[in-house]
Amino acid sequence: MSILFSPAQIGTLQLRNRIIMTPMHLGYTPNGEVTDQLIEFYRVRARGGAGLIVVGGCGIDRIGNAYGMTQLDDDRFIPGLRRLADAVQAEGAKIVAQLYQAGRYAHSALTGQPAVAPSPIPSKLTGETPVELTEEKIAEIVASFAKAAKRAKTAGFDGVEIIASAGYLISQFLSPLTNKRTDRYGGDLQARMTFGLEVVAAVREAVGSDYPIIVRVAGNDFMPGSHTNTEAQVFCQAMEKSGVNAINVTGGWHETQVPQITMNVPPGAYAYLAYGIKQAVSIPVIACNRINTPDLAEAILQEGKADFIGMARSLMADPELPNKAMSGHPEQIRPCIGCNQGCLDHVFRMKPVSCLVNAEAGREAELSLTPTSQPGKILVIGAGAAGLEFARVAALRGHKVTIWEESDQAGGQLILAAAPPGRKDFLHLRTYLVNACRDLGVEIQYHTKATPENILSAVQEGKFNRVVIATGAHPITPPIPIEEGVKVIQAWDVLAGRSKAGQNIIIVGGGAVGVETALLLAESGTLDNETLRFLMLQQAETEKELYRLLIQGTKKITVLEMANGIGRDIGPSTRWSMLADLKRHQVNCLDETTVLEIRREGVLVKNAGTQKILPADTVILAVGSRSQNELYQALQGKVEYLSIIGDAIKPRKVMDAIHQAYNEAIKY
């Protein structure tokens, strides 16, 4: 880690290392005022070793605002911001405020007034048509950027970042998709850059010549007809000439159809965008998006693709990532898995952000893992996500913990979740939990089937004085008539590799498990990455043919869902891309379809009042799960300290299981 942990500068700002916590919308400031929740969240990340923390977005006015956003539009916010700056700086990190104006991405229901934009082009995010900005109003917004920057400086912040990416207001002026103006702010690229340049000039005048200014740009908008990396380089060169001290390079707009930070994006996939900018400018460049490990961060720096590394969700997952890596213990880092369940999905639902893998995220002000005053001997039944997390936290608090696991491996449904394409990061979480338990002295006994008798015997012998049931759930077989001789298997068995499907497959159930199973099977017979790379390098096939070979597998797949819509239980930040993949792989999806019978010749279904047979050689069931709580019921009243966690209570998402297990463990 010779480069990652070396000191570096952005303008006059000296940083202790090259790890930058890039801005995240957290929703921790419901009234715009800095809260203790926000302060403790960032204090912990600063203490964990980050070199720079970028807070944001911070609203420069109310018309371009978002819910729960920290505000910089009035002097009354300065005292709270000063408390935040003091807290971060006291831990050795520096702090920067990101100046935010959403433009057409703002929602009138939140701001109380129509959104504004360079041109009245409807927003795909809000469904609203913004009001076209007058030149007078443009001047007001430019002034608001400057005033907000001045307030950040007055509050003791070490610099400011101007957001010119993600499809927000400056992006909207830059793009020909959203800027149809005929005045000096519209037309060719030079004219469309005018607004952004005016913002930078006004901010520079407000804060002085030696105050650091960063601009966050889209290395590629990933919007057909908008900016590519070529235009981004021209804009960044103009930013450098205007006095900007660093460029923070991210990916596309929020409405792009190219995934940006979901789990299926390969780690470091967009570092090439930062490298393109770095070749065009001489000021420092920050690489972002799915850079989740210190080793990857160091490799990007060693290859000369960037000068700094942006990590946001990685530091939400583990605030101590820098310190653990610097001390030579990267294996102890709790991994961000790119699931988006607690972060981006919560933003879309206008909820405060949390984290699937880190139940403490956003709760730093209220939680403190203190040693227990009464160390116990705890038996946990089941080494799934909930059982492992409970064991980890209980052991941290000083309990002696043993896990009985019936199978030959830990992880439970994390292993199933990792099976579909682009989902392997769930295995990183499994590895972390198993290793953390091992390091804390938790004993996992495999091939150990728990019964009421052997549990009670172990308790009576004094081996354990507390029992936690984490037996999870099992898949449901619905009460559908099934003709003898038909191949009917469970989706869980397909995901686990225990059952093989034929060539003409019907999946009953179009929720998350059904969709994931379909995507796994749809890749059967498609080009693998190594072959694709070889054929591309040799120019052996046309791009069109390579694309066909990449998406066209050897199986015919149909997904049936009784309700309206496919994948309705998948988070909004991920669902759209998974549905797009189903379409790409030509998976046939039928919703509002009831399965009546499963016969040798196929599946009898009813759709829109009409019955028909859908031919199939394999039927896969993905219709939900049921809690396995028989042990808990059998032990009630017989074990003094008995509790139940995770899916054993009620089937739930992994995040809910982990958080509930954590909450239970801190009670012990």
UniProtKB/Swiss-Prot annotation:
GO biological process terms held by the UniProt record: catabolic process
Keywords attached to this entry: 4Fe-4S, Cytoplasm, FAD, Flavoprotein, FMN, Iron, Iron-sulfur, Metal-binding, NAD, Oxidoreductase
Keyword Metal-binding: yes
EC number per UniProt: 1.16.1.-
Protein name as it appears in the record: Metal reductase
Protein purpose: Metal reductase able to reduce Fe(III)-chelates to Fe(II)-chelates, as well as soluble Cr(VI) and U(VI), using NADH as electron donor. Cannot use NADPH as an electron donor. Is unable to reduce riboflavin and FMN with NADH as electron donor. May have an in vivo role in metal reduction in D.reducens, which is an organism capable of reducing contaminant heavy metals and radionuclides.
GO cellular component, one term: cytoplasm
UniProt domain comment: Has an FMN-binding N-terminal domain (NTD), an FAD-binding C-terminal domain (CTD), and a 4Fe-4S cluster between the two domains. CTD is the main contributor to the iron-reduction activity, and NTD and the 4Fe-4S cluster are not directly involved in such activity.
Annotated Gene3D superfamilies: Aldolase class I (3.20.20.70), FAD/NAD(P)-binding domain (3.50.50.60), NAD(P)-binding Rossmann-like Domain (3.40.50.720)
Subunit structure: Homotetramer.
Subcellular location: Cytoplasm
Positions with a binding annotation for [4Fe-4S] cluster: C336, C339, C343, C355
Cofactor(s) of this protein: FMN; FAD; [4Fe-4S] cluster
Family: In the N-terminal section; belongs to the NADH:flavin oxidoreductase/NADH oxidase family.
Residues binding FAD, per UniProt: Q341, A386, E405, Q413, R423, A450
Binding, FMN: P23, M24, H25, G57, Q98, R216, R290, A312, R313
Residue ranges crossing the lipid bilayer per the database entry: none
